[in-house]
């Protein structure tokens, strides 16, 4: 099974990379979790933010192949318990398509990305810093896998 986290933003602090890698390395070989970073466009005082978001969205969608699943991470998405995420992960595995988890920039996701989405997932009703979202997604995917495999990590 192949999961891809496509996230706007690059040049994250070392602790973010280390946190992400900690959970990626724990996953079994049959569950691949890849990070694809989309550069954040420069936001100046007079920037056309709508245009920048659209460009970031185009770059995100360019990484998605036809037929692949798109899941957007949005505050307005569905909140899943660990067990619900484990069920989704199992469905995704049975579906046998690459799953792209999309995380937008500071202003969110482009409408085109949301329109392509098959599912909307919310980690929390709180506004979370994007670097932390990467680690949370990695940990939650790992935790969901442990539920499915009967591993004692999730008790």
From Swiss-Prot:
Its main location: cytoplasm. It is an enzyme of class 2 (transferase). The keyword Chaperone does not apply. S-adenosyl-L-methionine binds at residues 73, 104, 123-128. Disulfide bonds: none annotated. One of its GO terms (cellular component) is cytoplasm. Its EC number is 2.1.1.177. One of its GO terms (molecular function) is rRNA (pseudouridine-N3-)-methyltransferase activity. The keyword Glycoprotein does not apply. It is found in: Cytoplasm. Signal peptide: none annotated. PANTHER family: METHYLTRANSFERASE, RIBOSOMAL RNA LARGE SUBUNIT METHYLTRANSFERASE H. Belongs to the RNA methyltransferase RlmH family. Homodimer. This is Ribosomal RNA large subunit methyltransferase H. The lineage of its organism: Bacteria, Pseudomonadati, Pseudomonadota, Gammaproteobacteria, Pseudomonadales.
